[in-house]
Amino acid sequence: VKENIKGSFLGGDTRASGYGYYTWQADPEQTVSGAISEDKAWETYYHSILICNITLDNIGDISGSKAEKEDLKAEAYALRAYCYFMLVNLYGQPYNQATAETDLGVPVNDVVGMEDRKFVRESVAEIYRQIESDLKEAITCFKASNLTKTCFRWNLPATYLLASRVSLYKKEYDKAIEYATYVIAAQPQLYDLSAMSDDDYFLNEKNPEILFTYGYYLVSYYAWLAKCNFPISDDLQALYGDNDWRLTHFFYKRRAVYTAQKSETSGTTGIYGYAFRTAEAYLNRAEAYAGKGDKDKALQDLKTIREKRLKVYEEVQAVTKEDVIRRVREERRRELSFEFHRWFDLRRWDRPRIEHTFTPDIKQPDVVEKYVLEKDDPAF
């Protein structure tokens, strides 16, 4: 299993800006010059957690109907759960039931103001308990409010989707299936890519599978503004093949290479940002079925997706449990590429060996440095 991008210096090399991430440095914010840039993810997620804490602490003092207050509480709990989920998977160890109680996760911020206090890292298990508690509260509050929501606000189906993802990461397959099934029952339709115009972005207002959308679609500064430096990898491109609409609808071909383009990078009317999608619910459920050894149900969920993605439908060939698991992982890679899933999936699956090459000086293209992330490396 490989990753989804490869290095290139077509159009000038800006990979030096993302040097720390691209070359597996101990401090990923390190630039090629040795300077340390700011870690925006840590700041952004913990700031959001603080706002959620303040909201929940003051919910009794705000005006509004009981239903509106329950809905606001639900949104705060759901957002806080998502922030902790991202933080623990960015900075903590991958979830492993055997070691989760001692593996280091991230701090829990339970304050609503300034305190002279040193926060300590909680265990991975404790962070997942925090996430699950918040999701349970969010689901309860959303059901109590029963308000009609748009895809621009946290809502009940999106919360169930996150719950299915969390359960899948923990290999609690029955729960993952239960939560994913709720999502599919609430919003089963997938975007038929055969009807998608070449002028459209995939994440647009006509896409019926978007449960919740937020922000702008920044694959990353490096992968967007420097597309030619981060085209999709050869093996990812081969995984789609010419029969798959996703190759041309998820990516843009330039100078003989494909780059990610599921959405726009700015606020364009009718074009959405990051999204929670029904397709993930089918994939979460398929992976859970595969993990339980329920081959037929896993393949049925893959079929549902592939019927809307292939020009001519092809059956998935799988005989053993291992075959089914491999096919589910391949489909997940195709469908969810460049949507904040791949790195987390590599961490929780098999943590493979990954090799990157870096060209320090584009005027000397034959001078290449090689950087390797070994299998099961602690850097995962």
Listing of model-derived features with the role each one plays in the protein:
Residues 158-170:
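Hydrophobic/aromatic-rich effector regions of fungal transcription factors
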Residues 48-55, 83, 134, 162, ...:
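Amphipathic, well-ordered alpha-helical segments in soluble domains
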Residues 1-72, 84-126, 146-152, 160, ...:
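Short acidic-aromatic linear motifs embedded in glycine-rich loops, typified by GG[WY][YF]DAGD(H)
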